[in-house]
């Protein structure tokens, strides 16, 4: 089994929620924040020694206080860039090997991460998906005849479902993804 490292993208301002704190610190019904649920799920799926890296920006001190044992990557342009540039910074700062990365606002069950372990262990890049009906806001996907992702974006027509915002990038694919993210505009989503 490969040592697992997880990156949480938490630099954004979350302006659509209209709250005075980062979106990952939104409280859930069980009393935890979204980020605390993510951290708990990561520990449950991968163990307590998992390297967790969090990309911070907006009100970064609040995120640092919420996850003091994490490694932090600062996106100093958080108010001018979207997630592609935060992910780029994170991948450049990551340790060798595969990276599980997720958006800081994803609420999920630990089983999602446990299912991705096979991809991690076999060196496969993967995205977690939901095959329910999708709307314009979601990141949608299509697949080719071999079942591999063909298209992945908010503008996909005829999407089979949505990418839920939890992904694995294999070590062998990391350099290519870094190159593509470097080519993206500041306002692009991944």
Regions found by a protein language model. Name each.
Residues 1-8, 32-99:
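Conserved N-terminal catalytic core of the sugar/cofactor nucleotidyltransferase
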Residues 63-139, 143:
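Conserved beta-loop-beta/alpha segment of the NTase-like Rossmann-fold superfamily
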Residues 27, 142, 168-170:
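Short, well-ordered beta-strand micro-motif
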């Amino acid at each position: 089994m490969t040592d697992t490292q997880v990156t949480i993208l938490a630099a954004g301002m979350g302006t659509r929620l209209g709250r005075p704190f980062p979106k990952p610190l939104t409280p859930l019904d069980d009393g935890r924040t979204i980020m605390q649920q993510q951290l708990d799920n990561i520990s449950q799926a991968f163990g307590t020694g998992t390297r967790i890296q969090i990309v911070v920006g907006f009100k970064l001190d609040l995120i640092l206080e919420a996850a003091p044992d994490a490694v932090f990557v600062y996106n100093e342009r958080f108010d001018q860039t979207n997630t592609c540039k935060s992910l780029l910074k994170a991948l450049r700062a990551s340790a060798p090997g595969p990276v599980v990365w997720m958006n800081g606002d994803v609420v999920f069950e630990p089983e999602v991460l446990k299912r991705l372990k096979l991809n991690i262990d076999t060196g496969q890049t993967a995205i977690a998906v939901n095959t329910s009906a999708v709307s314009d806001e979601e990141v949608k996907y299509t697949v080719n005849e071999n079942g591999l992702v063909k298209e992945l974006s908010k503008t996909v027509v005829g999407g089979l479902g949505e990418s839920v915002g939890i992904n694995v990038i294999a070590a062998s694919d990391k350099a290519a993804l870094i190159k593509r993210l470097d080519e993206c505009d500041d306002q692009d989503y991944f």
